[in-house]
Amino acid sequence: MSAAATMPMPREASNYDEISMQQSMLFSDSLKDLKNLRTQLYSAAEYFELSYTNDEQKQIVVETLKDYAIKALVNTVDHLGSVTYKVNDFVDEKVDEVAGTELRVSCIEQRLRMCQEYMDHEGRSQQSLVIDTPKFHKRYFLPSGEIKRGGNLAKLKNVEGSFDGEDDWNQFRNAVRATIRETPPPPVRKPILQSPSQRKPQRSATFSFSSIATAPKKEQDKRAVSPHRFPLLRSGSVAIRPSSISRPTTPSKSRAVTPTPKRYPSEPRRSASVRVAFEKEAQKEPEHQQQPSKSKRLLKALLSRRKTKKDDTLYTYLDEY
């Protein structure tokens, strides 16, 4: 127990190496004391045994032995606790050192990786400035079988390609022009404008009904004279013919005659739809202005028609009027 009591006090260390060396020496001394504790206990037991045999005051020897055994046990437990604490402290310190070393290594690796990425980026930027990138243009193939004629427009097959120089571009432009010349667009029909001298003399807007009045009655029943210059073509459907039915054979005094407007050489020809609309507007008259004789004949023809016959007789009758 004298070795444990005479343990030297650690001196203040100046740097990290001295501190680690001092701690390692203290740990080794603690292990030596723990190893010598067994020999000390055995020597104390032999001493008390001899004293108890040779000494007459055995009661005093027994009391002294009890006190020594208690102190020796307490010192042993204390010594084991201190050694255990030192071992744990040493292990924790080494673990912390390892963790700190790993952290520093990871930081160094991260810095190296960032430096490498920066160097690669700078190298790529420098190479991009040095390298002359080629310019690509569009190339068009114009096979004669795939061109669809549609006026001045043609459907082209677009294929991405590259032109090596200005000569290729000139050849391509000449080929396109030659192809366009080979496939001329279909001719567009233009309206032929005739001079006023070549046109036929137009009829005047005034009408004379003396010839109609002096004509025989049969001819008047067959066909009514149309006051318009361009009469409409008749068809077989009944839905289109009501305008022709409402037209009377003889003009009434209350009905105003709408003359056909004159056309000049510079005026474009009107379409058929415009002419039909104009004639329909001119033919809109109230039904009460029709002559009673014609309505009677129409009613008589409808009543005298047989049921077995078809509507051809009615259509022919309506076509006459």
Swiss-Prot record:
Basic and acidic residues composition-biased segments: 279-288
What's the main place this protein lives? Answer: cytoplasm
**Localization annotation:** Cytoplasm, Cytoskeleton
Q: Which domain of life is it from?
A: Eukaryota
Q: Which UniProt keywords apply?
A: Cytoplasm, Cytoskeleton
- Describe its partners and assembly state: Binds SCAR.
This one is known as: Protein ABIL3
Q: Which organism is it from?
A: Arabidopsis thaliana
Query: Source gene?
Result: ABIL3
